[in-house]
């Protein structure tokens, strides 16, 4: 197994910097609906289908996204 470790979010709301770390680490995670102060983080599966998305300010946003990052996230090489 490689030394790649999943990049996860805090269990609650997350910052733009935290979202950028995740989008940099994964090929299939994107920021959408960027309103400046708030935005959605979106995860697609390997086939490109939407798996999950959350606004960055949701109280349990990271808790909702982290299982999908761990199971569906495609780490960049």
UniProtKB/Swiss-Prot annotation:
Q: Which organism is it from?
A: Escherichia coli O6:H1 (strain CFT073 / ATCC 700928 / UPEC)
- Which InterPro entries does this UniProt record tie to the protein? DUF905, YkfF-like_sf
Q: What is this protein called?
A: UPF0401 protein c5157
* Family indicated by similarity: Belongs to the UPF0401 family.
State the source organism's domain of life.
Bacteria
Q: Which Pfam families match?
A: DUF905
């Amino acid at each position: 197994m490689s030394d790649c470790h999943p990049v996860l979010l805090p269990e609650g709301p997350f910052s733009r910097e935290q979202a950028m770390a995740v989008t940099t680490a994964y090929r299939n995670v994107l920021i959408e609906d960027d309103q400046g102060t708030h935005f959605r983080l979106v995860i697609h599966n390997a086939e490109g289908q939407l798996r999950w998305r959350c606004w960055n300010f949701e109280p349990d946003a990271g808790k909702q996204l982290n299982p999908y990052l761990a199971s569906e996230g495609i780490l960049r090489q």
